[in-house]
Amino acid sequence: MTSEAFEPSAAAAPAPPGRSARARSFNSAAARYAAHRPSYPPALFDALEELAGRPLAGSRVADIGAGTGIATALLHARGAAVLAVEPGDGMAAQFRRLHPGLPVVRGDGNALPLADHCADLLTYAQAWHWTDPARAVPEALRVLRPGGALALWWNINALDVPWIAEESARVARHFGVDTAAERRDIDALGADPGGLPRLTRREVRWSRRVPIDTHLANLASRSVFLVSDEERTAAFLTEQGDHLRNAFPDGTVEETYDVVLLVATAPS
């Protein structure tokens, strides 16, 4: 598939690459992001097909805020005709290196470079929170065909797993961030979709077992680490690595996630 399958909009130019320092921070760490971030389980895409009311195979899908293409590649593997939309220079360049056969265009959810009613499905994997919903909701409804679906999802740390909760608390103390805010924000979006049609929610728990160094590299690819002082980040990663090696002497950890999926259907 080529990007010509989605007709570009003459009026919409690609938006600037990010709304904040945290959003822009991924561009300098794109290779690390691609190498160490978790993927998504097959059950997520089964749930997506169920809630969207259509198979991915043969669907015209635009993956917005595609990053390095983790979700884009999985959508393609399920048979979707998928186009990636990514605002960041570094992330888009890494996408092209990893997925030379998949189309990617520059833009973001606030000003989609796509024609009206051209997509069966819009996906935002770990990306909706970087948009301005007052702009992104009308854009999504403009680009979706009647009856098409908007799908938002996030890998959320499973804070009922003791070692993950302890690590999250350490991150919060060290960097002065609210590590539980992500789930609260998603819960709030589900309760008040802010102009979106009614959102249907599904959660999928999954896990991956990785070496401790891979887990630490995953941590270091998160925006709160990327915008922090390098010395402060290095100190935390060293301390946390020592703690994990004491707790898990075999050198591996099981990262457990809840993928929270929200799906809305455009009016017919």
Give the residues covered by each predicted segment.
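Conserved class I S-adenosyl-L-methionine
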Residues: T2-L56, M91
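Conserved Class I S-adenosyl-L-methionine
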Residues: S3, A188-S268
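A structural alpha-helix within SAM-dependent methyltransferase catalytic domains
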Residues: E49, A73-H76, V137, L141
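Nucleotide donor/acceptor-binding cores
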Residues: G58-S59, H117
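Class I SAM-dependent methyltransferase SAM/SAH-binding core
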Residues: A62, T68-A111
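A short acidic, Gly/Pro-enriched loop at the edge of an enzyme's catalytic core
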Residues: N110-L122
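A short SAM/SAH-binding and catalytic strip from SAM-dependent methyltransferases
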Residues: D120-A134
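Conserved catalytic/acceptor-binding region of the Class I
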Residues: R135-V210
